[in-house]
Design a protein with these regions (language model features):
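Short acidic-glycine-tyrosine-enriched beta hairpin
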Residues: 69-84
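Structural motif
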Residues: 62-64, 71, 87, 98
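A generic "binding-loop/recognition-motif" signal
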Residues: 18, 40, 51, 70, ...
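A short, N-terminal "cap"/entry segment at the start of jelly-roll beta-barrel domains
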Residues: 1-31, 116-141
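Short beta-strand His + acidic residue motifs that chelate non-heme Fe in jelly-roll/DSBH
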Residues: 45-47, 65-66, 82, 88-95
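Glycine- and acidic-residue-biased ligand/ion/polar-headgroup-sensing regions
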Residues: 51-53, 58-63, 68
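Conserved short histidine dyad/triad with adjacent acidic residue
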Residues: 34-49
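A short hydrophobic beta-strand segment most commonly corresponding to one strand
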Residues: 35, 55, 81, 96-112
């Protein structure tokens, strides 16, 4: 059994937003759970994933969510599903509050070695570098 309080996760920043790693891929081999806080008026960079799907659980705030060519406004509490190989991004539409959601990434066939090489911190450092090359803010890794 694995139980962790949100306060026990490890915080990090990426593309101007704050995250807390709760359940790293290193410990599961098949999934990952991360809290994400999007600053007022902020967005996540557009991205997609070849080998995993994601579930977003919104619990505070309002967002515009783009998934696979469709945009929808979402008010917490709400849930969204992002299939593999589908471009997606999230925008906090509120100017005075953070958007809070939990995303759960699931690899149905297990996490490929190249997506866990060096541990989750190394994987996210590569993601941050990728976003920086596209002009998104560079944060501490």
């Amino acid at each position: 059994m694995f139980i962790r309080q949100f306060s026990e996760g490890e915080p990090f920043r990426c593309a101007g937003n704050e995250f807390v790693m709760l359940l790293p891929r290193d410990e599961t081999g098949a999934c990952e759970a991360v809290l994400q806080m999007v600053r007022p008026g902020g967005t996540t960079p557009p991205n997609s994933h070849e080998t995993f799907m994601q579930i977003y659980l919104f619990w505070a705030g309002e967002a515009r969510v783009y998934i696979g060519g469709e945009m929808q406004r979402v008010r917490a509490p709400a849930v969204a599903f992002v299939p593999p190989r589908t471009e997606h991004w999230v925008e906090n539409v509120l100017a005075d509050r953070e958007l809070h959601y939990l995303y759960i990434s699931v690899w149905p066939d297990g996490i490929p070695p190249e997506e866990r090489e060096g541990g989750w911190k190394n994987v996210y450092a590569k993601i941050i570098d990728s976003y920086a090359s596209r002009g998104y803010p560079v944060d501490a890794k």
